[in-house]
Amino acid sequence: MTPSFLLHLRLADPSDVTSLYDIRQAAIRQLSLTHLSECEATAWAERGGIPRVERAIAKDELWVATFGLQLVGWLHRAANSIEGLYVSPPAARQGVGTALVRLAESHIAQTGHPLVVLESSLNAVGFYLRLGYAPAGTQCSSAAVPMSKHLEAAKHVGRSPLR
């Protein structure tokens, strides 16, 4: 997929639910197979369905990325945690995930949190390492790696960037 439109980021709304669920399913089933068996990917894809997405939308915790009118990715953030990041396979490696993570980091920094935490799927560890995240804590699951990143901007919340 070569985007013919600029990437646009916005809060998700209830009309997005089905598309977001479909993106999650496709991303897990197609992009995680480099590190998971098909059975493991299917089990993961079937957890946390539509009700979880609806709750995140209701709390304004879910952002979407679009190329034109097409939803191509989404990120769920709660407090200082990235709870999930999914990009449509045709839009993978085109900056969608990076843009969503940067947006989440900005919002987290604005709330004064100095640290972003997440659990990365095995296939996404390299992506998060490139964005400055580091393994953190004890890995309790064979399919998830705890990671974190310190945010310098959080130290300057409320200050003018020119000071």
Question: Could you describe each region identified by the protein language model?
Answer:
Residues A91, G95-L103:
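Conserved acetyl-CoA pyrophosphate-binding loop and the N-cap/start of the following alpha-helix
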Residues Q25-P51:
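Conserved GNAT-fold acetyl-CoA-binding loop/helix
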Residues F5, G112-V125, L131-R163:
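C-terminal "cap" of GNAT-fold acetyltransferases
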Residues I82-R93:
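A short, internal acetyl-CoA/4′-phosphopantetheine-binding micro-motif in the GNAT/acyltransferase core
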Residues G73-N80:
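A conserved beta-strand-loop-helix scaffold within acyl/acetyltransferase catalytic domains
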Residues H8-D22:
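A short beta-loop-alpha structural element at the N-terminal edge
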Residues K59-G73:
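Conserved beta-hairpin
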